[in-house]
Amino acid sequence: HLINFAINYCDFIMSTNEGDAVATCSGAYLAGKKPVVLMQNSGLGNAVSPLTSLNDTFKIPILGFVSHRGQPGTKDEPQHELMGAITTELLELMNINWEYLSKDNVIASKQLIMANEIITKGKSFFFVISKNTFGDHALISNVKTRNVFINRNEILNQILRHKADDVLFFGTTGKTGREMFEIDDMENNFYMVGSMGCISSLALGLSLNSRKKSIIIDGDGSLLMRMGNLATIGFYKPKNILHIVLDNNSHDSTGGQFTVSNDINFVEIAKNCGYDNCIELEDKESVDQALTNWVKNTTLTFLYIRISKGSKKNLGRPSVSPTDVSKRFKDFANKKND
């Protein structure tokens, strides 16, 4: 994997979202460097604003590598279908030169020379990466790790035990929703796919318009990508939201690359954003007790739990389509309690 190689051997900056990555590369260019931005095409939408209003406006060229999940003619997950169909067209609409990177090393070397010439002339260039263009590359750990022994599956089991007719569960993008599905698939579960970082915004919109209780199960990477929503939630203070963050200091579903969460005090941030009750928990028992207390006396609450990296082997994916997940979830959310 190209990102793993870059982390191992290059001056790599782990941005929290693709738009920030583009802006950071642009700053490096202004410092006289030749920056490269790496992203999955599902995040290309996040990069549109700086690519069109920063790079194009200020004539700051960057080199980009973007994957092609959902490439037409290939089988992929449903959340990649639309972006896969429009990835290259979107680059063209932004007046960005692009090519598919060849799997042949000789041809690819010539492509890189060509791209450098275009960038030298002040124009950005993106390589679109088809599946299997790069081989596997092991990630060398280069950040300090934490000794954490509780895993996500254990915590999710504790959380989902608190199911009720007036409780909705929102599972963030990646392994969280997949594990929730395997533990207990319910019509009041929303399994987010794609839209990384948007789970808390989704829950906010529902919670402000429903009396049902919303339990958000978030991750460190997801929260960091859209951390501004903590302030929005804190401002509107919906009492029926319980926001749980499971922090494994990694992007687990994309290969375990580190996040920048290691030295962040999310509990204090949530408190300063206006959450009424903010607690760090360290074991399953305290998680169970905290949920029991919240269900009895709902108030805007933030729970933070450090967990270990990794998930169960051969983890499956929800067999219920996103469309059906949305429909049954809406039906449940609008069902009147007896």
Q: For each of these PLM feature ranges, what is it?
A:
Residues 1-92, 96-203, 208-212, 260, ...:
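Thiamine diphosphate
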Residues 42, 213-223, 228-230:
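DG-centered beta-turn motif at the end of beta-strands
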Residues 52, 226-247:
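A short alpha/beta connector and helix-capping loop motif
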Residues 123-128, 299-305:
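Active-site regions of oxyanion-processing enzymes, predominantly non-cytosolic
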Residues 129, 217-220, 246, 305:
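Active-site flanking residues adjacent to catalytic metal/cofactor-binding acidic residues
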Residues 169, 214-217, 244:
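Residue-level marker for buried hydrophobic side chains located in beta-strands
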Residues 241-276, 280:
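A contiguous pocket-lining binding segment that forms or flanks enzyme active sites
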Residues 283-296:
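A short, acidic, amphipathic alpha-helical segment used as a generic capping/interface helix at domain edges
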